[in-house]
Amino acid sequence: MFVDDNSLIIYSTWPSTLSDSSGRVIVMPDNRSFTFKEGFKLDESIKSILLVNPSSIDLLKIRVYKHRIKWMGDIFVLFEQENIPPPFRLVNDK
């Protein structure tokens, strides 16, 4: 996923699929990245928030905070999950 330079990244586990606006992969958290447990502030310079693997409580906290400070920006949610095949084989009985 491409992340804008004016975006804030809030994560529970760091994803492996983030790229900045120039196309380089963001390997490690930087100064615009926070965990859900850390404190952060939103201001007018931040145009969007990327939430990575949030819990339902984390989503609710961010939504309440956004509404309370009347921040007008976009929120994007990214869920990462392993693609594990089912323990059985699907068979088509034609």
Swiss-Prot record:
**Main function:** Late protein which is a part of a large complex required for early virion morphogenesis. This complex participates in the formation of virosomes and the incorporation of virosomal contents into nascent immature virions. Required for the stability and kinase activity of OPG054.
For this protein, what is any one GO molecular function term?
hydrolase activity
Segments spanning the bilayer are: none
Where does the protein end up? Answer: Host cytoplasm; Virion
Superkingdom classification of source:
Viruses
An annotated GO BP: DNA-templated transcription termination
* GO CC terms in record: host cell cytoplasm; virion component
* Protein known as: Core protein OPG142
What's this protein's family per the entry? Answer: Belongs to the orthopoxvirus OPG142 family.
Q: Quote the subunit structure annotation.
A: Part of a complex composed of the kinase OPG054, OPG092, OPG100, OPG114, OPG115, OPG142 and OPG157.
Q: Which UniProt keywords apply?
A: ATP-binding, DNA-binding, Helicase, Host cytoplasm, Hydrolase, Late protein, Nucleotide-binding, Phosphoprotein, Transcription, Transcription regulation, Transcription termination, Virion
Decide whether keyword Repressor is in the record. no
InterPro entries referenced in this protein's UniProt entry, alphabetically? A15
* Native organism: Vaccinia virus (strain Copenhagen)
